[in-house]
């Protein structure tokens, strides 16, 4: 069953039963109590203890404390799987909050009080050569213009909601919008239909769904749905049991991620 250089993407494509086999092989404790993403990260962590491995995450920089940062591989949020990134690496490649950074990672040194993983070598920033990151523009310096490219949302003949948007409230790339509706009016279903339209009609676009102050079961439902329509789509969340500071932090990280995509000329 052993496979070298497993990545989080590799494991997320496998069934939970298959990941259990890796967990048993690496002798991971209490693996049956973990969800799929937590277990996948635990397998990668166990693999790292045997050899260097490649991992990626969303960068959060602490400018007020020396300029170092952490890669957040799990839900844009702090976790024990975070990867330390030195200030010198951040400065060398001109990295910013919200960048997706990938590279070779080393496990914590034995006997050290530091239990964090460390980035040894950066080989990709937002999926491209890291040297390209230094020459990109800054989001505040970009010129705002009116949308000039329509985003078609209709994707299912049986669904009239997205068809009505296209007819009466058309949406363009770069446009902001708001859904105003009372509770239990079907906003979640509406968002699902919009996500399906983006995934079908704008395949090169990056789909990120942000859920704030929602129930955990709503998060699970959206995660399952988004993964079924768009393998590269993301669901980022801060559920109602989290502190308000968590809601703000997650929202800011997703906004930073969106700005980095725009700087990279991605939709």
Predicted feature descriptions by range:
Residues 53-55, 160-164, 254-259:
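Phosphate-interacting basic helix/loop segments used at nucleotide- and nucleic-acid interfaces
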Residues 19, 39, 69, 86, ...:
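Residue-level signature of catalytic and energy-coupling elements of molecular machines
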Residues 1-51:
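Basic helix-extension-helix modules of the SAP/HeH family
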Residues 32, 37-133:
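N-terminal "pre-motor" subdomain/linker immediately upstream of P-loop NTPase catalytic cores
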Residues 246-267:
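Phosphate-binding/switch loop-helix module in NTP-utilizing enzymes
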Residues 105-110, 120-163:
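Phosphate-binding P-loop/Walker A region and its immediate neighborhood
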Residues 5, 9-13, 29-37, 111-116, ...:
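Conserved phosphate/pyrophosphate-binding and hydrolysis machinery centered on Walker-type P-loop NTPases
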Residues 144-146, 150-251:
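Phosphate-binding glycine-rich loops and their immediate beta-loop-alpha structural context
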